Design a protein with these regions (language model features):
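N-terminal secretory signal peptides that target proteins for export/translocation
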Residues: 1-37
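Sec-dependent N-terminal signal peptides
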Residues: 38-48
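C-terminal motif of bacterial Sec signal peptides marking the signal peptidase cleavage site
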Residues: 53-54
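Ser/Thr/Pro/Gly-rich, low-complexity intrinsically disordered stalk/linker tracts of secreted
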Residues: 64-273
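Extracellular/luminal Pro/Thr/Ser-rich low-complexity repeat and linker "mucin-like" segments
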Residues: 103-107, 114-159, 278-301, 390, ...
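Extracellular/luminal low-complexity segments enriched in Ser/Thr/Pro
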Residues: 149, 209-211, 281, 334-339
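Extended, charged catalytic domains and RNA/DNA-binding interfaces, predominantly
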Residues: 284-324, 331-713
Length: 713
């Protein structure tokens, strides 16, 4: 059964196919020990069916040498019929009806007053050798917790469940083998109470109550990692990592989570990499900040690096020769600089440890383009999660990382409306915390924070909703009033808000394009994230579980007009750098706006003055007869020439491999030889009515960027 009051139970995630890739948290309350684990097996079967639902998506596009397709014309097919409120329900091809129904039924499932009673806390933490904590990310150790029964106690045949996170490689709390990691013991000092722990191979341990009831105030001691190999903790550093206890107080097989989890702080692993982030666009004489961070191997901040960072700045960039780290800065510093001369500049840096064995980490910052009156590119990650749904870390840490480590200009935290342990749509205090944190970090002209959440529809695909003001409501996908896109857009009508479809071509669930993107509320779409690319099946990092015909290029081919952005959809607390902890890449949005404000960001997104990357800070300019990316050109007249001038310029982070020109589904390719700065200008046949054209950039490293299309009216 499903609970609506924070009484969810997360099942074991299913690798990179469904649970892990989606970073989902199952929301079930049936006590598995009562059903011989049939419930959890059903969830596993559901996850497997989700994998099998994916099919290979293909289109008719063929990559040809540059020049071949530049001289061809094609017209997109006619538009599909648009959805209306009067029509019957139409769902995504791979809609997860079982998940939707489980979540919905849990909103009305009654539980006994004794369910969810009690409290729990962390007693001690230690490394395997017995040294007291805190534990480092990815380290094995031992954690001891106490659960104390609430006023109504726990009856005979009732259960207390101990649960660790199903994400980031926490070891499951098993009681089968003391010689294996994750071994967990339970005990009580309550005379006459017998504890019967049962583990079903998931991230939770069910503790049955026998002999007599566990009375109010009586305790259960849980030692996680009691064996000699301990238990491995989160691979990402975070404050307040949550360990939940849920209680079936009357033994009826339904349980509820207690009001608050036991928490433990996980500190960063040892320093392993240097990251330097700088603005991409500056004018001569302009001051800037270089954000310099020494991170652990998974990208977590908080390292105690002690030493120096030396800079090799090119002529035209003024920076200190070196900065010193004492070990108390949390592994990060702001370093001021000045762009003295026009040009393309790349800053190199070396971090040298000052204690014991010397270690060196090298990095090259993203390129800086310095020009008079340059169009400003602002880097944004407007899709990510914290521990308030299915992510890692606090909202405050999320925004701090975005600015002080990733050097972002614009960021939004978009926790799920109804997915996790406690749900945003049922806990107004959590939504208030997010609103307060967004306000506290917002600094117009320096750092723009945007209020948001994720509309998590398992029937029509996931969208994040962001508000360009301090306040906004959660219109939950589980609420029948807002369960399809038309209802959501009706609720948002007239507000300074936007929606963004993401992982639209597959992954956890694809977007139901039967509801066309709203012309005002959804002008752009997210085509790259940790899930992969939804641009096209021929993208080098195409999304897993693809749905045929559901890629964004398929959408363009039938006449819809959307711009492109990327965003991380990170669940690791690292907005702007989600790709550091994910081999498949991440996502960033490049937004052209002179005014670094919520109003300027909203205007640029509505105008589609954007491009997408998979995490790299590639700079590009694209125009067609002076019309910039995202533009809809006016209708052709008899006086117009038969050709148009296409201008492309790319400045990359690493050696370039290809630049593709995508025209109405056809592709022409420039094969490159490792250039870092590439430009091209040529005449092409004029775009005909209904056509579109965009640019795809591919680096040798796998870094990608996509310009928003230019459309012919």
């Amino acid at each position: 059964m499903i609970s609506s009051r924070g009484n969810s139970l997360r099942g074991r995630s299913l690798g990179h196919n469904f649970g892990d890739a989606c970073k989902s948290k199952w929301s079930v309350t049936r006590s598995t020990s009562k059903t011989d684990s049939r419930w959890i097996l059903a969830l596993l079967a559901l996850g497997l069916s989700a994998v099998l639902l994916g099919c290979s998506g293909e289109s008719d596009s063929t990559v040809r040498p540059a020049g071949d397709v530049l001289n061809t014309k094609s017209k997109p097919a006619g538009l599909p019929p648009a959805a209306s409120q009067d029509e019957g329900p139409v769902y995504s091809v791979d809609a997860k009806h079982d998940i939707h129904n489980m979540l919905r039924s849990g909103m009305t499932t009654p539980v006994d007053p004794s369910d969810g009673g009690g409290k729990a806390w962390l007693v001690s933490e230690a490394r395997i050798n017995g040294t007291p904590g805190p534990l480092r990310a990815g380290e094995a150790g031992r954690l001891e917790f106490i659960y104390e029964a609430g006023p109504l106690g726990v009856a005979v045949d009732g259960e207390v469940h101990f649960q660790v996170s199903s994400f980031w490689q926490w070891d499951p709390p098993q009681n089968k083998d003391p010689e294996s990691r994750g071994y967990t013991t339970v005990r009580t000092d309550a005379d006459g109470v017998e504890l019967t722990p049962v583990w079903h191979g998931t991230e939770l341990l069910a503790i049955g109550i026998a002999g007599r009831s566990l009375e109010a105030g009586e305790q259960i001691h849980v030692t996680y990692g009691a064996g000699k190999f301990g238990a491995k903790v989160d691979i990402f550093a975070e404050r307040g990592a949550e360990h939940w206890f849920s209680v079936d107080g009357d033994g009826d097989g339904l349980r509820k989570f207690i009001d608050a989890p036991a928490t433990v702080d996980i500190i960063s692993a040892p320093s392993a990499q240097l990251v330097v982030m700088v603005p991409t666009t500056l004018e001569p004489g302009e001051e800037f900040i270089a954000f310099v961070s020494i991170l652990d191997k998974m990208g977590s901040t908080g390292t105690r690096f002690s030493g120096i960072v030396e800079f090799d700045a090119p002529d035209g960039i003024e920076l200190p020769a070196r900065v010193k780290f004492s070990g108390n800065e949390g592994g990060r510093q702001r370093v001021p600089g000045i762009a003295r001369k026009a040009g393309v500049h790349r800053i190199s840096a070396t971090a040298i440890s000052g204690k014991g064995q010397k270690l060196e980490y090298k990095a090259t910052a993203n390129p800086i383009i310095v020009e008079e009156n340059i169009a400003r590119v602002r880097w944004a990650d407007i899709h990510g999660h914290s521990k308030l749904s299915d992510g890692t870390g606090t909202p405050d840490d999320y925004f701090t990382y975005a600015r002080e480590v990733a050097g972002l200009d614009i960021v939004s935290l978009t926790d799920h409306d109804h997915w996790g342990i406690q749900f945003l749509d049922e806990h107004p205090e959590m939504w208030q915390l997010i609103r307060d944190t967004v306000k506290a970090h917002h600094r117009p002209g320096e750092f723009v924070t945007v209020l948001g959440y994720e509309w998590t529809s398992w029937l029509h695909g996931h969208r994040h909703v962001i508000y360009f003001e301090d306040e906004g409501e959660i219109y939950s996908a589980l609420d029948p009033k807002y369960e399809n896109p038309l209802q959501l857009w009706d609720a948002l009508s007239g507000q300074p808000a936007l929606t963004f479809a993401h992982h639209s071509a597959g992954g956890p669930v694809s977007t139901n394009w039967y509801y066309p993107p709203h012309s005002v509320l959804e002008p752009v779409t997210e085509i790259s994230s940790v899930h992969g690319s939804s641009e096209s099946h021929d993208s080098p990092s195409a999304i897993y579980n693809p749905v045929r015909g559901n890629f964004v290029r398929d959408l363009l081919n039938v006449g819809f007009r959307v711009g492109f952005i990327g965003s991380g959809d990170g669940h690791d607390g690292h907005p702007g750098l989600a790709h550091l902890g994910n081999d498949g890449g991440g996502g960033l949005a490049a937004i052209f706006t002179e005014e670094l404000s919520r109003e300027g960001t909203l205007e640029a997104l509505r105008a589609r003055r954007t491009y997408a990357t998979n995490g790299a800070r590639i700079w590009m300019q694209v125009s067609l007869d002076g019309h910039v990316m995202g533009t809809t050109m006016p209708p052709r007249t008899e006086a117009d020439a038969a050709t148009q001038t296409l201008k492309i310029r790319v400045v990359s982070e690493g050696p370039l491999k290809h630049v593709d020109i995508v025209r109405s589904g056809n592709i022409s390719r420039f094969d490159l030889n490792g250039e870092l700065d590439w430009s091209n200008e040529r005449a092409i046949p004029r775009l005909e009515r209904g056509e579109y054209q965009y640019i795809r950039v591919i680096e040798e490293s796998g870094a990608l960027a996509w310009s928003s299309p230019i459309f012919a009216n």
